[in-house]
């Protein structure tokens, strides 16, 4: 086999190996992104519920304070 062809085949082999490493890393990053998005969504949902509960508690406090002022 011609030395130039060997060199080109060797280069193709290196590029294919790099391509596979990159593909594996992309799959890993996509998995991390899905997990991160899920975690973010769960935390955001929890904070929305916490905010609603705080608002309800503040409303209860304000109502009690208003009742006490009118006694």
Residue ranges of model-derived segments:
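Short, charge/polar-rich alpha-helical segments
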Residues: 1-20, 45
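Short, charge-rich amphipathic interface segments used for partner binding and complex assembly
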Residues: 21, 27-69
């Amino acid at each position: 086999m011609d030395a130039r062809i060997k060199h080109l085949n060797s280069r193709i082999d290196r590029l294919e190996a790099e391509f596979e490493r990159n593909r594996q890393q992309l799959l890993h990053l996509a998995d991390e992104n899905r997990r991160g998005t899920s975690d973010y969504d769960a935390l955001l949902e929890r904070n929305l519920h916490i905010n609603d509960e705080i608002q309800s508690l503040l409303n209860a406090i304000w109502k009690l304070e208003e009742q006490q002022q009118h006694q």
